[in-house]
Each structure stands twice: as C-alpha cells, then as structure tokens.
C-alpha cells in the first residue's frame, strides 16, 4: 500500500489525538500524536486498522 510509505504527519493544528501510522524504518505501526488537521493517508484510528492496511 503506497499510502503506508507517506511520512508520519502531525499537522499544524493543536489538537492531541492518538493515532497510528506505519513507520517504514521500523517495519511496524507506531503511535503518534495527530493535531487534528491536514493529515495524509498514513493515519489510522487504531493499530489494527494500520496493520491491516500496511503489514
């Protein structure tokens, strides 16, 4: 899935939402804090969604 290779993007907004993204350097899904706007497609609400899409 090419979306999984996109960089992990917090975005410019000031929210604090736990999300998951695929980290290609670690070959796994990792948690990060999402600000709430301007996400890219490498942004999943659960680790299960991330793993289903990217692993």
Curated annotation (Swiss-Prot):
Domain BPTI/Kunitz inhibitor: 4-54
PANTHER family the UniProt entry points to: BPTI_KUNITZ INHIBITOR DOMAIN-CONTAINING PROTEIN, KUNITZ-TYPE PROTEASE INHIBITOR-RELATED
Keywords: Developmental protein, Disulfide bond, Protease inhibitor, Serine protease inhibitor
Subunit and interaction comment: Monomer.
Tissue: Expressed exclusively in the middle silk gland.
UniProt GO MF annotations: serine-type endopeptidase inhibitor activity
Described purpose of this protein according to its UniProt entry: This cocoon shell-associated protein inhibits trypsin Activity by forming a low-dissociation complex with trypsin. May play an important part in regulating proteolytic activity in the silk gland or protecting silk proteins from degradation during histolysis.
Any GO CC annotation of this UniProt entry: extracellular space
Site (Reactive bond for trypsin): 14-15
Disulfide links within the chain: 4-54, 13-37, 29-50
Native species: Bombyx mori
Protein name (Swiss-Prot/TrEMBL): Trypsin inhibitor
More details: Has an isoelectric point of 4.3.
């Amino acid at each position: 899935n090419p979306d999984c290779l996109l960089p992990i993007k917090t975005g410019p907004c000031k929210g604090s939402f736990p999300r998951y993204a695929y980290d290609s350097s670690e070959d796994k899904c990792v948690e990060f804090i999402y600000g709430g706007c301007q996400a890219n497609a490498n942004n999943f609400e659960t680790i299960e969604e991330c793993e289903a899409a990217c692993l």
